[in-house]
């Protein structure tokens, strides 16, 4: 165990985590990513697009709170768990409704809060995509997946080494 602990300590030191600068860099990347997601959601809302949430997950609630999103930004979150219907997200107080109810609202974008289930969601929700809907995946990089041809639009022309996307929307 001592050898593994020593390896871990060396890796932390080599990556700058022995000093506050290493943590400052992580904080700065997280804040930049948050700012870019806030900007994208704001621009989409300002252009008249309807954005709803998809999946009332714990990870998603952390993201909603960190970004400061409210029901003004995301009016409702689609969920499959009936126990959550009629409830609200912690702190941000965004209402949670059934997926069927939210999809009937014909949102232009669904902000995916359990983004780690990306592949399963894209397979499961082909009908939504084929009918013109788009998924907005906030992490690990901001990514928009749109309909018919499963074109992917990214929030940037590239994702930098830290995993943060920068720039504007483009379609490939």
Language-model features, listed with the residues they occupy:
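Histidine (H) residue identity feature
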Residues: 1, 33, 61, 91, ...
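Short, structured coil/loop segments at alpha-helix boundaries
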Residues: 1-5, 81, 125
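Flexible, glycine-/basic-rich loop-and-beta segments that form/coincide
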Residues: 1-29
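Intrinsically disordered, low-complexity regions
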Residues: 5, 114, 166-168
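Flexible, polar/low-complexity N-terminal or interdomain linker segments that lie immediately upstream
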Residues: 18-46
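Intrinsically disordered, low-complexity segments enriched in glycine/proline and serine/threonine
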Residues: 34, 82, 151-153
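A solvent-exposed beta-alpha-beta segment
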Residues: 40-122, 131
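Non-catalytic N-terminal targeting/anchoring module and adjacent flexible stem/linker
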Residues: 118-124, 130-172
